[in-house]
């Protein structure tokens, strides 16, 4: 873990450009609650805030992840992350499919963001992220492509198109008169 944190610090110090609209911003991003230790998450949060960079990880992507965190830590994934100070306007989570209502309100209240990856979520049958609900509550939402293992092209314009069509279809179900 010390090597990861040292390398992270070095990467931020060497490459991070905090100026507005910079295309060279570094974030600290342990992969997911089932592949990174609790201590790495805690120390990453401390380091990121010390260096003034953002935090990113996957969260609430699958029901398997939710069950893993509940079993191992006795908490829902967002409560687990909050216990390690992974909440706030410097944090964003990829996916966010399985957040409950009260968790969406917490995300909105704290300015914690969600990166929507609809193509990956469709390919893996993970579920549909509640983007319309998030936007109504004021959760910061971005659009992203996932890694190459679950996204065939890393095409952000295609991701935009699919997000539009997916949520148009999904919202039409509740708007039938």
Residue ranges and their predicted role:
Residues 61, 118-122, 147-149:
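Short, acidic/turn-prone active-site loops that include or flank metal/cofactor-
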Residues 63-75, 103-108, 125-134, 151-168:
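Histidine/acidic-residue-rich catalytic or RNA/ligand-binding cores of hydrolases
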Residues 83-90, 132-177:
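His/Asp/Glu-enriched, well-ordered alpha-helical/loop segment
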Residues 45-54, 86-89, 106-115, 136-141:
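Glycine-enriched alpha-helix->loop->beta-strand junction motifs that scaffold or abut catalytic
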Residues 5-18, 26, 110, 127-129, ...:
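Domain-wide signal for the mature, well-folded portions of proteins, strongly enriched
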Residues 1-97:
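Metal-coordinating catalytic core of metallo-dependent amide/deamination hydrolases
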Residues 28, 58, 93, 107, ...:
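Divalent metal-coordination and catalytic microenvironments
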Residues 90-100, 117-123:
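Catalytic beta/alpha-barrel core
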């Amino acid at each position: 873990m010390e090597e990861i944190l040292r390398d992270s610090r070095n990467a931020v110090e060497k490459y991070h450009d905090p100026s507005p609209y910079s295309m060279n911003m570094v974030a600290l991003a342990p992969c997911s609650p089932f592949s990174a230790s609790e201590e790495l998450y805690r120390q990453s949060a401390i380091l990121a805030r010390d260096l003034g960079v953002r935090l990113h990880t996957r969260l609430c992507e699958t029901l398997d992840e939710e069950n893993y965190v509940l079993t191992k830590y006795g908490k829902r994934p967002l409560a687990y992350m909050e216990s390690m100070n992974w909440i706030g306007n410097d944090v964003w989570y990829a996916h966010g499919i399985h957040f409950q209502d009260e968790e969406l309100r917490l995300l909105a209240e704290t300015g914690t963001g969600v990166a929507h990856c609809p193509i990956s979520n469709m390919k893996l049958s993970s579920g549909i992220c509640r983007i319309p609900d998030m936007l109504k509550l004021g959760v910061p939402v971005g659009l992203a492509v996932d890694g190459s293992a679950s996204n065939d092209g890393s095409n952000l314009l295609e991701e935009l198109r699919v997000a539009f069509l997916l949520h148009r279809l999904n919202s039409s179900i509740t708007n039938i008169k």
